[in-house]
Regions:
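Negatively charged, low-complexity tracts enriched in Asp/Glu with abundant Ser/Thr
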Residues: 1-30, 105
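Intrinsically disordered, low-complexity regulatory regions enriched in serine/threonine/proline
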Residues: 2, 28, 34, 41-108
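Short beta-strand micro-motifs enriched in acidic
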Residues: 18, 38-40
Length: 108
């Protein structure tokens, strides 16, 4: 998957662009990114924001090695399957964004 494919997947799965990167937010603070995908020239990194505010890389992979799962479409190689909290956070973000859209842009 390339940068555009990863971005399209992320936006369809509850991520939003914050400060130029596809990001997941805290459920209670929907404007503050706590997980982000950072695109470099040849690799994509998954970073998590530490409580002190510093970003820490938790995984990374060359674009050529990131492949969409044939059943779920989820990118492999970035740790989404090995860290269950990412799935829950993505679902929380996706649900919140859907509720905002249903409410005409207002927070649920």
């Amino acid at each position: 998957m390339d940068k555009e494919e990863l971005t399209a997947w992320a936006l369809a799965n509850g991520w939003q662009i914050i400060a130029g990167w596809p990001s997941l937010t805290k459920p209670r603070a929907p404007k503050e990114a706590i997980v982000r995908m950072v695109f470099k020239a040849t690799v994509v990194n998954l970073e998590v924001k530490k409580p002190a505010g510093k970003w820490e890389k938790v995984s990374g992979e060359a674009y050529g090695k990131v492949v969409a799962d044939p059943e779920t479409g989820r990118p492999s190689g970035l740790g989404f399957d090995s860290i269950p909290s990412f799935s829950m956070l993505m679902q929380d973000n996706k649900d919140r964004l859907m509720m905002e859209r249903l409410n005409g842009g207002r927070k649920g």
